[in-house]
Amino acid sequence: MVSVRRRALKAANFKAVEEHIRVGKPVIGIRTANHAFSLRGLEPPKGHLVWENFDAEVWGGSYTGHHGANKAVKIQKLSDHPILEGIDVDTFKGRGSLYIVKPIA
């Protein structure tokens, strides 16, 4: 599971993550995993590695930023999706911002 934001990993840890992914083992990403190992072009500390194209190469995405935080996220269009079972989609309010990820593979 990848749940980090803009981190350079120690080389040994990076190689373990990279090998896990490259051999086709499963990987799950949580929100900021889009830019998990990107330092926006900055040099990583000595002995650390980055993966600037992680988003495109692993997730098939293209993270370009995020929308501003709104007071609510409407989910009515997905009301019949199994993941929303038991959720009142008419009153649900999510807080936070949504990522801009286009195109999605």
Model-based region annotation:
Residues 1-5:
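Cell-envelope and extracellular/periplasmic
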Residues 6-89:
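A glycine-rich, often tryptophan-bearing local segment used as a flexible ligand/cofactor-contacting loop or short
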Residues 86-105:
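Active-site oxyanion/phosphate-handling segment shared across diverse enzymes
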